[in-house]
Amino acid sequence: MKKAVLSLCLALSTSFLLAGGDLSPVEPVEAGKVCHQDLTYVEEDVNLMWQDQQYTDAEDSAVARTHNSGKAGTWNHAMSYCRSLYYAGYSDWRLPTSDELQHVHRIDGQVFTHFRDKDFWTSTPTTENKYYVVYPADAYIYKRYRSETNFIRCVRCTGENNKETN
């Protein structure tokens, strides 16, 4: 039986080689040629590009437990996070205005791959040291103290004057 299997393997290998098969090993992919594209959503009608990055358990916990972590935290953390963000090849991210965030959440269907059903910070001030947040399910705005924690989604302009060269 062992001889039969060995003979069959030898016969198939010989046939493959005679038929013009190529048994050369697959070349390894160079690290510089592997590309992971960051997800974004582009609103072409208003020239805005939105960060569409996965939310982590730590960020979910930050909102629930009132602390800062990545794309979740206080208003000051949100401003700092967006200003220092390098994502999708760009570094000119900012916290959206309430009008911008409401606009994107009024589009039919869920435009973001990664989303949360909780409030998101905006850069628009209200009164009494509060800022507007937008609840994505209904695109309504609400007032929140800067010390409260909410989710963060950064935005950037995509107009001709705002393009970076990579």
List each model region and its residues.
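Sec-dependent N-terminal signal peptides
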Residues: 6-10
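Glycine-aromatic-enriched surface loops/turns that form tight recognition elements
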Residues: 2-5, 16-94, 98-166
